[in-house]
Amino acid sequence: MAHPDSSIIPDSVQSEYLFYHGRPYGSDALLGPLEVLLNKGFAVAQFQNRDRFIFDYNYGGRHVWKSITDLRGSVQRFGGWNEVLRTEVLPTSFEWKNWKWAPNYIGHVFEGGVTNRKIEEWYRVHGIPMPGVAAFLTTMTSAVINEMYSHPGVNQGSASTAMDLLLFDPLGILLFRHDRVSRFFSKRLGARIWSGQAGLTPSGELVNNGNNLILKVPLSLIPGTSFFTRAGLAFTPGFTFHGTNGLDVSFGFGAEGRIQGIDPMTGEEIPQLAFGGGVFLDRQGSLLASVLASEVEHRRLVVNIYPGVIPVLGGRFGTWFILRESGALRFGVSARGALGVGLGGGIN
């Protein structure tokens, strides 16, 4: 396994980087623009009712266009501005059916903002001109792909999509441009992004992707532990136990996204949840391995081992497999330096 202090970022400037630390192992080793596009842009592929053959897909491009250019019509179909503000923007109700504001802040503002800041730091380390602009384009492209992929074949706009693209996604980017905000989330809340080892099969199926916001909040009453939360299309709270050399073990159990329904009249997203959770091993915030189990049919058991863990060919490669309820198996490899795009295969 790679040395815990190894990094492509010199020690003299490490403090300037809050979410990307250039670790040549774990999830850090897979970061790149394609990794963001596949893991964030297609995050809802984790729902079991999503078609994961992304090269032959009826994307909702017209839906996104109409949501942005016909905002008035989109809001009217949703029930008016009062309804939009009550359910999408302001936490005025804690009834489950009115909790749409929660994923807007957690997924689009916080997870999206941290993702943008992380890829901006990656661009800066790799000498990409105007890293802030490059990160903005990468993150917003992922956000647009997410909405197009979430609304296949939908031609009319929706207030939900408009709020995501015009308010919450830009708000997250702007918020985490501020060093004070990013430092608070990174240092005080232990915020990280743990992404899947996204793979493409020869038939064009996208597998094993996902983008999750991780929080580790230290528990002063129990030394060496933190309150752990994994959020994205899941919410699995638990605990982290801090070991030596920056090695942490985390446990989290709760809800996993199972089905994403779309209201044909309003374009409103209606998720269904299932029980799930997992165990996670990371070093210095870079995810090394994870085991996830859930009631979601197409990912009953998911095992990921990231680059730098298996000492074969210099620890360059990672591996993963997914067991489905039907007994079908998906498996694949990832590679450090491949910008987050791996090769997958399967047995049905």
List the predicted regions and their residue ranges.
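Short juxtamembrane and helix-loop transition motifs at transmembrane-helix boundaries
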Residues: 91-98, 121-129
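Membrane-interfacial alpha-helical segments at the cytosolic side of multi-pass membrane proteins
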Residues: 110-126, 166-182, 338-346
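Long, acidic/polar, low-complexity amphipathic helices and coiled-coil-like
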Residues: 120-121, 129-131, 153-156
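Membrane-interface starts of transmembrane alpha-helices
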Residues: 103, 129-139, 160
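Extended amphipathic alpha-helical segments with heptad-repeat/coiled-coil character used for oligomerization
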Residues: 161-212
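Short loop/turn motifs that connect adjacent beta-strands in outer-membrane beta-barrel proteins
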Residues: 124-134, 178-195, 265-267, 312-313, ...
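N-terminal targeting leaders of membrane proteins
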Residues: 1-113, 207-228, 240-249, 259-274, ...
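Interfacial helix-loop-helix junctions of multi-pass membrane proteins
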Residues: 142-167
